[in-house]
Every structure is written in C-alpha cells, then in structure tokens.
Amino acid sequence: MDRKISIAATALKAAAVFMLTAIIFVAIIFSLPTPEGFPILEYHQVTNEAVDLDFERYNVPPDEFAAQLDYLQANGYTTITLQDFMRAVHGKGSLPPKPIVLTFDDGYKDNYTTMLPILEAHKMTAVVYVITNELGKKNYMTHDELKDMQRRGIEIGSHTADHLPLTSLTTDEQLYQITASKRFLEWSGLATIYSLSYPNGEVTTEAIEFLRQENYLTAVTGDAGLNTLETNPYKLYRVNIRKPRFGLTEFKFRLFKAEFFAKLRNIF
C-alpha cells in the first residue's frame, strides 16, 4: 500500500513539474516581441451546408466569414495575393502595413457563389487553389466560373490534379500532379498559374524542384507561422481556419497561432 502511495506521489510531483515548466515556457513565449511577418489563412468552404460531414469542420458559414472579414478590416489588415508578395520579393512593389493572404483550397462551387460576393463586398482579394480533375463535378466550380473569378481579381492556383499527398507518390507521380494541373489550367484559357497548395500541406524536396522547373513562384504548406520577404516561397506558412465554435474568439486565436509558431521558430 505504501509503495502504491509513493508511486502516486511521484507521478503527481512529475505532473506538477511538467505543468509548471509548460506554464513558464508559454509565459516566456508571450513575453517575446511580436515577430515580423504576415499570416496566410487557409479556408475551404464558405456555405451553410458542407459537402459532407467529413468536411463540416473545414466549412465556415457565410455570416461567420463576413464577420471575420469585418474584423480584419477593423484591425487594419489589407488582403494581398501571392503574386503581390512575389512582386515585393523582387523589388517590383511594396506590401501594405498589415498584409494578409486569404487562401481557399479545393475549388468548391460555394467559393464562387457565396464566398466571392462577400469578399467583393469587403473590397478584398484572395487566392483559390483548385483540384483540376474535380472541376465541373458536383459541388465544384466549372471552368467558366473559375475564369470569371480570375477576371474579377482572384489569383488562381493549383492544388494538383488529384489531391494526392505528394509524400505518398513516386517522383514521376509527383511530377505529373504538379505539371498536369498547371498546364491544364493554362491551356483552358486561364492566365499563368504561379502558385500551388500542397495536398494535406505535405512537402517533398522533389516537389520543390519540380515547382521551380515548371515556373511556379510560390507554394503554401500546412505549417502555421508568419511569412516575410525572406521566407522560402515554396514553403510558405499557413494557419487553418476551421468552422468556428466560439465565433470571433476562435478566429482571433487562429491569428495568434500563426504568431505563436513564428515566435517558436525564432527560439529554435
């Protein structure tokens, strides 16, 4: 009995030490100055009804999305595209004081029917990444909708041909996914495609080399953080915006998450 009590006491002490260490560590992170850089937000659907229950957690209802844009405007953020970012990288332009990039993965039809009108009402822009082999299918945009979206100032990017994690593919398969999607979009009448979103945010060294070969200029990951003009343009940080359970409070937390991980990288 005494041995069990001793083991329990030791476990409690270890847990207390761990909690205290964690609290001190987080306090140190909070005390650090805000790092330079801008966030890239990762959205998927903007609708009252997600494609299916599996995707519900990635859906932001229209009223919540509008409230998030209101918050960004009220706090001085200006949306930019990743082409704007690269122009600044090459000294051909400058970024506004508080830039932010809104990205939308997959190419859902509600991006055109619901998201775009809300975005335009706020005089904002975005980058939309499409899975080319899904275009025209149920719940996805058509070619004409995609072209109209680009004509209205939205940057269009590739989310590969089939949305297969590149880390699970052979070198030749990665090359196909990266090149086929870009060429298909450009051959179908869209302006040059310069950006790619890695499926599931997973990056490979081979993919980065293929992106360079195919004249992509940027690519976004699933890793949270902030981006600067010195950030590797093929490994840009993004923070995922999920269906909010706590309204703007959760959205603010997501913005802070990008800052928090940027602070961590500055330490390590």
Predicted features along the sequence, with ranges:
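Substrate-binding clefts and substrate-entry loops adjacent to catalytic sites
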Residues: 157-172
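C-terminal active-site subregion of NodB/CE4 polysaccharide deacetylases
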Residues: 2-13, 18-102, 108-110, 168-268
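Residue-level marker for buried hydrophobic side chains located in beta-strands
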Residues: 102-103, 156
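A short alpha/beta connector and helix-capping loop motif
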Residues: 112-132
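Short beta-strand and adjacent tight-turn residues that come in two discontinuous sequence segments
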Residues: 129, 159, 219-221
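Short histidine/acidic/glycine/proline-rich micro-motifs that form metal-
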Residues: 132-136, 165, 199-202
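Acidic (Asp/Glu)-rich catalytic clusters
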Residues: 116-123, 141-158
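Charged helix-capping and loop-helix junction motifs
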Residues: 139-146, 173-177
